[in-house]
């Protein structure tokens, strides 16, 4: 493993939240100055590599892997294609957790599910079912996620108060989602289909 490959692996797993310089330096056990040199090498590597769709983004001293702007239209098209209309079990599970626990960070969702949720969160954002709602005032200031107004339309409700009662539901049971009711799951897929046709 090289320093660059280690950084890449960490940033990939961190997903949308990214990692701060301090977090990366601690995880890699290297000085910040040396880390900055490696990050610069990584940025240049991605910029020069036409066979890579990735780019290194730095914002407020937090680093994350993102796709290059050149791929925006392609990814937008992907998010609207029929092949991507059905939400996976993982995405439905994450959406359920966010609906009942919002505002919530990606790490908190991960802790409930026991697995990384970056991909599911990105997909839910692409469908406009969830959105960022500021940052949690803790170390690293991770993004907070909430359901969107569009989510209410998908569920056929006017407010979150109309969601099924979760008082007796243990969300850590990974088999439970809002969409265990097959009718609801079919409805959300149908709504996605109708939206893409409009």
Swiss-Prot record:
Its main location: cytoplasm. It is found in: Cytoplasm. Keywords: Cell cycle, Cell division, Chromosome partition, Cytoplasm. Gene3D superfamilies: Winged helix-like DNA-binding domain superfamily/Winged helix DNA-binding domain (1.10.10.10). GO terms for biological process: cell division; chromosome separation; DNA replication. It comes from the Bacteria. One of its GO terms (cellular component) is cytoplasm. InterPro entries: ScpB_csome_segregation (IPR005234), WH-like_DNA-bd_sf (IPR036388), WH_DNA-bd_sf (IPR036390). Pfam families: SMC_ScpB (PF04079). Homodimer. Homodimerization may be required to stabilize the binding of ScpA to the Smc head domains. Component of a cohesin-like complex composed of ScpA, ScpB and the Smc homodimer, in which ScpA and ScpB bind to the head domain of Smc. The presence of the three proteins is required for the association of the complex with DNA. Belongs to the ScpB family. Participates in chromosomal partition during cell division. May act via the formation of a condensin-like complex containing Smc and ScpA that pull DNA away from mid-cell into both cell halves. PANTHER family: SEGREGATION AND CONDENSATION PROTEIN B. This is Segregation and condensation protein B. It comes from Streptococcus mutans serotype c (strain ATCC 700610 / UA159). The lineage of its organism: Bacteria, Bacillati, Bacillota, Bacilli, Lactobacillales.
